[in-house]
């Protein structure tokens, strides 16, 4: 169980299924047994925008390379006019106005990851799943992204489940850390 506004970290060696677990929690894959519930409702019953959003480790794989980034942002759950929230998130994520006219291949990994995070922070997002989202970035960009993301999730009571190989990072950003190890039997 992940409580509203809680920050949970997940650590495990490579190949232990951390990304698969997040895919199940996001509804991209079905579990072999059991079910994922959001406020008591099975996740597969949600239609349209699902309040569980995933931010992938490789942002270039989560966007359509043929779409301008303004369209990528518009895929998020925003009020019709874009709203104050979207503007605030874009500012917190350091998204420059001129980037919106570009295509994904025209941005760096860090710049593109900022778009992916902003898109995931739609107005109805309740749980954010973060899969090694800053592993490929320099330390300054990592700090900027995590600072903005934690500020936004805290102010809106959004739960965060973060996967990382960095114990130090998870200790700084999470209230609880789950260590996955080999399961026998």
Stretches found by the model and what they are:
Residues 11-13:
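The feature captures the beta-strand-to-loop junction immediately N-terminal to the Walker
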Residues 26:
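Helix-to-loop junction immediately C-terminal to a conserved catalytic motif
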Residues 41-53, 67:
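ABC ATPase NBD coupling module
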Residues 103, 132-133:
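Walker B catalytic motif
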Residues 103-107, 111:
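Conserved ABC ATPase signature
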Residues 117, 129, 145:
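Hydrophobic anchor residue at the start of the ABC signature
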């Amino acid at each position: 169980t992940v409580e509203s506004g809680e920050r949970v970290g997940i650590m495990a060696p490579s190949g232990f299924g951390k990304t698969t677990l997040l895919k199940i929690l996001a509804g991209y894959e079905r579990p072999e047994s059991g079910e994922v519930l959001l406020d008591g409702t099975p996740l597969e019953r949600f239609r349209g925008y699902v309040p569980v959003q995933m931010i992938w480790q490789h942002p270039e794989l989560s966007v359509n390379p043929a779409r301008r980034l303004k369209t990528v942002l518009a895929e998020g759950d925003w009020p019709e006019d874009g709203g104050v929230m979207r503007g605030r998130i874009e500012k917190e994520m350091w998204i420059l106005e001129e980037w919106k006219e570009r295509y994904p291949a025209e941005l760096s990994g860090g710049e593109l990851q900022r778009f992916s995070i902003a898109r995931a922070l739609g107005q109805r997002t309740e749980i954010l799943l973060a899969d090694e989202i800053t592993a490929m970035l320099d330390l300054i960009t990592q700090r900027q992204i995590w600072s903005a993301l934690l500020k936004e999730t805290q102010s809106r009571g959004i739960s965060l489940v973060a996967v990382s190989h960095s114990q130090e990072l998870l200790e700084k950003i999470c209230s609880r850390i789950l260590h996955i190890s080999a399961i026998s039997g």
